[in-house]
Amino acid sequence: MMTAVAIASLSVFGMPTTASAAELAGSWSGNGSIRLPSGDRENARCNVTYSRSTGSSYTAFAVCATKSARVSQSAKLQRVGGNAYEGSFYNSEYNVSGSMSVTVSGSSQVVSLDGGGAQASFRLSKR
């Protein structure tokens, strides 16, 4: 369960870099790594769908899995400049929340998460 909580606290999103803001919307998938509160690391795979809410605000829904757990979470992001986005995520199953940043560069993005005593980083590609 500790792995599931860590995934829940970390598996969703990151910071964008060189695509237009409109290019954040859509489906993305990729791999990354989670550092658990115990200090252990696990590889994870995530599928994320971003939707524009208003202007420069987005919502996201992600499903991420490691060899030991699978979790779903939601997020809210705000464009903070260029192709950089920041926001927060929440996993209702484990009641875990945290901060996240996304940087988009063309058809790829880097996502960083911090919450629930764990950190994660993912590289996602547009599907």
Enumerate the language-model features and the residues they cover.
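Bacterial N-terminal signal peptides that target proteins for export
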Residues: 1-6
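C-terminal segment of classical bacterial N-terminal signal peptides
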Residues: 9-18
